[in-house]
Amino acid sequence: QSGKTLKIAFFLNLGFTILEFFGGIYVNSVAIMSDAVHDLGDSLSLGTAWYLDKKSHKEADDKYSFGYKRFSLLGALINSIVLIGGSIYVISEAIGRLFEPQPSDAQGMIVFAIIGVLVNGYAAWKLSSGNSLNEKTVSWHLMEDVLGWVAVLIVAIVLNFTDNQYLDPALSILITLYILYNVVLRLKETL
């Protein structure tokens, strides 16, 4: 069951990541482009988590006399490391936009934010009933993505009424700092 939910989450996230890259360029939003890079890392992590989860269900053999259950923990560790790397990239991009602000297409951001809430929310819901630490780590991260998209939606609505070009990168930094905080907590749990 866990492999099936990880598979669904993987393909949803990968498809949405591709859409985000094109959409972020189209609406000129660093928050959406940053999230696309972040979601690419998530897709890689989900793919790894899916593979390692399948591996963790193998029976013990001569090579691994206690079985493969620890592969699920390895998936959580890899997930955390990828998220830390992606977060560092996101912060560096957003800081650049604070010094050289650029206008974003607020209407386009609203559309992507709604899609982001729906896609990530569905994937998080599918994984929320998981039993492995790997599934729980992925589910928590997808819920953080939902919160990030809600914040993007709020900022996009505000941008409809103002011309504050600092909101997009500032939001990107806040979301990323929140994600980093939670990843470090889960990384400690994994180790």
Residue ranges and their predicted role:
Residues 1-25:
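Histidine-rich, glycine-flanked metal-binding segment
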Residues 1-4, 8, 31, 37, ...:
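Alpha-helical transmembrane segments and adjacent TM-loop junctions that form the membrane-embedded core
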Residues 22-35:
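Short, hydrophobic transmembrane alpha-helix segments
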Residues 42:
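Acidic (E/D-rich), amphipathic helical modules within compact regulatory domains
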